[in-house]
């Protein structure tokens, strides 16, 4: 029995290691002047772009902090899960990047590899430049242990009854500083910026006197959009500091907190600027209050309606059933974090939302009044990966059916009148569109995208047999059309603005755009392009529309607190006119334009070779 027990333990740990290491993948390695890249065959395009970007940003970042790593930095590129993130391990001088681009509803869209490589390498350099002792010594402590008096002669020491420990951290970088500098990057960098979403969250907190305090910015562990607010406020605070003291203050802070006996970021700031952390925070927050008061002073009264879903911190992607008696939406009610969304169905006549599926993150689509399809993360597979799959739910039977296995499909859309379904799949950082019969699932690819363009959601114009899609290839989401006869994909929106969440209904194309600096819902009716513009006042920020006849379901961030709700506005019933003037949100820049960092003709500096 004991042998079986130990055999089971050995098998468990052996299985865990094999899952973690993904032995099914063929890994390769190449080196550039300052980096070592590891990638598997399925991520070659991402690795090549990452190599170009990394060498491009190496000198500006190391010059800013006057610091270079002691050896080449290792960058690992992987696409083993439907998960998007980057991680910097400063003491290991290593970066991990997932090839899947991050798609967060409360952040603007930026070219993923340019953004994440620069962001994580700033973490590497800033943290290493701020270490007090050595890259091999993350910290230490002094400890005293007291013992009871010995009771017997044959006992050398009594039982320990006292312990005193005093830690000496090797690094003291608070979250706002780490994330603020990583988003600031360096002078002239435009791979990330304070876009309309970040501006919206800070504006909401300022106008409702809910800005995180200096102390609250020093720690994560917050629910809702609290952690995201640390990113936003840190970014804004660092930008303000550099505007007052120059970008060299980033290096000065690292130099100051690297001193062996400097354990306070507030005192470090005082030694550099003459003001402690709280004093600088008050100056920055006063600047924001004045700035936002001036920006919104000319805005007219808001167009608003009755809130119909506000439980939880986020309620998004409302989608009407064909008969208009129910709607589906995603919500994080009963959960703590923004990304923990589940799928709910609500009948209009009773208003009681019922959860039907967990771990759903993209917009669902109705097949008919009793069936809908959606994408959600499936359970871990035999290789240790977690992928998105398409599922169908029968409302009559209250039964879920899995339609794909390890499919990696998101944002399914049923094409009205065609008995077909399309979905997106993102591999190696690029999204392609797949189509299948809705009754016999067998997805076939209909686009050939390999340039890092990412697609998010779609809507169907049955009359013209067109898909309207929002996607990203540089900065901000853009609108595309896909001809369902020729499969030609064309960008149709202004690249200077972020245009997203299209919805086509009865010859009207509605979408959200930040042309004024605040997102507004715009509707183009027929080809005459008459506009219904719902302008946003103060913190209100509509993102998406789901039209039902003359009813518009919108998502917004309400003025009274930082959470997203679904609200409805009866245009004809309340006598609200079909046309509003665009209200410019002054002093807010449009999306920053930049040239894509183009890889060399030969790709990576060295040809990839298998890992020995």
Show the residue positions of the predicted features.
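Juxtacatalytic substrate-recognition/specificity segment
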Residues: 16-167
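Beta/coil-rich, acidic/histidine-enriched accessory regions frequently appended to metallopeptidases
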Residues: 18-20, 26-29, 223-229, 253-371, ...
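Acidic/His/Gly-enriched intrinsically disordered linker/tail segments
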Residues: 21-23, 92-94, 112-116, 128-244, ...
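Pro/Ala/Gly-rich low-complexity, hydrophilic intrinsically disordered segments
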Residues: 277-308, 312-317, 524-612
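A short beta-strand motif characteristic of beta-propeller blades
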Residues: 304-309, 351-357, 398-404, 442-448, ...
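A flexible loop/linker signature enriched in serine peptidases of the S9 family
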Residues: 311-313, 331-343, 356-361, 375-391, ...
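Blade-terminus and WD-like Trp-Asp/Gly-His loop motifs, strongest in beta-propeller folds
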Residues: 318-326, 364-371, 412-419, 458-465, ...
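Short loop/turn segments that connect beta-strands within beta-propeller blades
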Residues: 347-351, 394-398, 437-441, 483-487, ...
């Amino acid at each position: 029995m004991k042998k079986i027990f130990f055999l089971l333990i050995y098998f468990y740990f052996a299985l865990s290691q094999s899952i973690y290491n993904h032995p099914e993948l063929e890994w390769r390695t190449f080196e550039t002047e300052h980096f070592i890249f590891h990638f598997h065959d399925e991520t070659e395009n991402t690795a090549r772009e990452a190599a170009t970007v990394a060498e491009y940003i190496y000198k500006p970042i190391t010059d800013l902090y006057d610091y270079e790593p002691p050896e080449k930095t290792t960058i690992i590129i992987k696409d083993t899960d439907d998960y998007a993130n980057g991680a910097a391990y400063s003491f290991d001088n290593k970066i991990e990047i997932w090839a899947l681009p991050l798609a967060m509803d409360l952040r603007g869209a930026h070219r993923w590899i340019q953004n994440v490589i620069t962001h994580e390498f700033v973490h590497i350099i800033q943290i290493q430049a701020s270490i007090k002792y050595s890259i091999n010594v993350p910290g230490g402590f002094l400890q005293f242990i007291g013992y009871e008096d010995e009771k017997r002669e044959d006992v050398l020491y009594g039982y320990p009854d006292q312990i005193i420990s005093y830690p000496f951290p090797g690094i003291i970088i608070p979250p706002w500083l780490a994330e603020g500098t990583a988003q600031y990057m360096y002078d002239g960098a435009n791979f990330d910026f304070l876009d309309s979403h970040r501006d919206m969250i800070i504006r909401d907190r300022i106008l409702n006197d809910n800005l995180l305090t200096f102390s609250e910015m020093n720690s994560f562990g917050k629910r809702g959009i609290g952690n995201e607010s640390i990113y936003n406020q840190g970014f804004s605070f660092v930008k303000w500091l550099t505007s007052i003291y120059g970008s060299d203050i980033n290096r000065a802070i690292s130099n100051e907190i690297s001193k062996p006996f400097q354990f306070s970021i507030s005192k470090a700031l005082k030694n550099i600027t003459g003001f402690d952390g709280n004093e600088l925070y008050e100056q920055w927050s006063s600047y924001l209050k004045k700035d936002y008061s001036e920006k919104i002073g000319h805005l007219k009264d808001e167009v608003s309606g009755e809130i119909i879903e506000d439980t939880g911190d986020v309620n998004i992607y409302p989608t009407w059933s064909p008969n208009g008696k129910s709607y589906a939406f995603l919500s994080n009610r009963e959960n703590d974090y923004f990304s923990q969304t589940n799928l709910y169905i609500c009948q209009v006549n009773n208003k009681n939302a019922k959860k039907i599926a967990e771990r759903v993150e993209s917009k669902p689509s109705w097949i008919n009044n009793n069936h809908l399809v959606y994408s959600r993360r499936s359970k871990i597979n035999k290789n240790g990966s977690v992928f998105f799959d398409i599922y169908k739910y029968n409302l009559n039977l209250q039964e879920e059916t899995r339609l794909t296995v390890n499919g990696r499909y998101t944002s399914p859309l049923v094409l009205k009148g065609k008995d077909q379904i399309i979905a997106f799949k993102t591999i190696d950082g690029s999204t392609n569109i797949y189509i299948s019969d809705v009754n016999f699932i067998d997805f076939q690819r209909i686009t050939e995208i390999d340039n890092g363009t990412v697609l998010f959601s779609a809507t169907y114009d049955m009359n013209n047999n067109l898909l309207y899609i929002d996607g990203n290839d540089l900065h901000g989401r853009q609108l595309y059309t896909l001809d369902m006869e020729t499969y030609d994909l064309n960008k149709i929106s202004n690249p200077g603005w972020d245009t997203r969440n299209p919805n086509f209904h009865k010859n009207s194309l509605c979408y959200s755009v930040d042309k004024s600096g605040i997102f507004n819902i715009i509707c183009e009716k027929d080809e005459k392009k008459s506009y219904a513009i719902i302008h946003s006042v103060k913190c209100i920020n509509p993102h998406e529309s789901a039209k039902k006849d003359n009813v518009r379901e919108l998502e917004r961030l309400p003025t009274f607190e930082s959470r997203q709700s679904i609200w409805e506005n009866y245009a004809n019933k309340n006598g609200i006119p079909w046309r509003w003037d665009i209200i410019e949100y002054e002093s807010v820049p449009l999306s920053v334009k930049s040239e894509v960092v183009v890889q060399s003709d030969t790709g990576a500096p060295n040809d990839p070779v298998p890992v020995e």
